[in-house]
Amino acid sequence: MSDMHSLLVAAILGVVEGLTEFLPVSSTGHMIIVGHLLGFEGETAKTFEVVIQLGSILAVVVMFWRRLFGLIGIHFGRPPQHEGEGKGRLTLIHILLGMVPAVVLGLIFHDAIKSLFNPINVMYALVVGGVLLIAAELLKPKEPKAPGLDDMTYRQAFMIGCFQCLALWPGFSRSGATISGGMLMGVSRYAASEFSFLLAVPMMMGATALDLYKSYHFLTAADFPMFAVGFVTAFLVALVAIKTFLQLIKRISFIPFAIYRFIVAAAVYVVFF
């Protein structure tokens, strides 16, 4: 792969990662399809995908830095001082409770989960995840018990963490699982989305660190320009995607995202079978 071609591939995949990582549509499904169409597959491709996820994580940190800073401050007894830090009722305990189920299962079944990274499993996950999105819209309480982040209970945070375990199934979508779970637990669509983004920071950083530790030997100095382009592109696109998504869900339901997932599942079938 020539230098210019590899940089173009990196930019395209960075756009795909940034657009889909935090939408309930499965970034994994999109990366598998696009990577296959571009001829970019194998161990280097898997490591590349892990690295550019860091760009998406950085976008969340930039978008929610006040809230994240506020969570840390509250833990050390510092009251909220800015509107963006919330009212002080969402704490690191909520985040921890949301992390525990998936962390435990992810560590226990890490190798088994990696063996599921193939088109057929991703295709099924896209469909089941789409059904869950529809179920969340149809079965959620008419009036949310937790309209805002600061209204969430520890139980709701833990149950969202349990739903997050579904995202260990490649193609399911971490944001789709957590947001759907939040809505079914009585959290508003917007608050569930915000919590999903906040939860993504420690979860994705931990998962990325573990994957990099296990695959760092596939990295070479020659790969740095390609990885850097993918990282920066994913970061910039994710910034726009997160902001747009949070505005969009104030006006529409998740039904269109579910339908889109079914279309992507059909595309996986056409491309790979």
Curated annotation (Swiss-Prot):
Transmembrane segments: 45-65, 90-110, 116-136, 154-173, 190-210, 222-242, 252-272
Localisation per UniProt entry: Cell inner membrane
Keywords attached to this entry: Antibiotic resistance, Cell inner membrane, Cell membrane, Cell shape, Cell wall biogenesis/degradation, Hydrolase, Membrane, Peptidoglycan synthesis, Transmembrane, Transmembrane helix
UniProt superkingdom: Bacteria
Predominant localisation class: membrane
Presence of keyword Ligase: no
EC numbers on record: 3.6.1.27
Topological relation to the membrane, as annotated: Multi-pass membrane protein
GO biological process, one term: regulation of cell shape
Enzyme class: hydrolase
The keyword 4Fe-4S appears for this protein: no
Catalytic reaction annotation: di-trans,octa-cis-undecaprenyl diphosphate + H2O = di-trans,octa-cis-undecaprenyl phosphate + phosphate + H(+)
NCBIfam families from the UniProt entry: PRK00281.1-1, PRK00281.1-2, PRK00281.1-4, undec_PP_bacA
Misc note: Bacitracin is thought to be involved in the inhibition of peptidoglycan synthesis by sequestering undecaprenyl diphosphate, thereby reducing the pool of lipid carrier available.
Family: Belongs to the UppP family.
Described function: Catalyzes the dephosphorylation of undecaprenyl diphosphate (UPP). Confers resistance to bacitracin.
HAMAP family (UniProt xref): Undec_diphosphatase (MF_01006)
PANTHER family: UNDECAPRENYL-DIPHOSPHATASE
Name used for this protein in its record: Undecaprenyl-diphosphatase
Source organism of the structure: Enterobacter sp. (strain 638)
The gene coding this protein: uppP
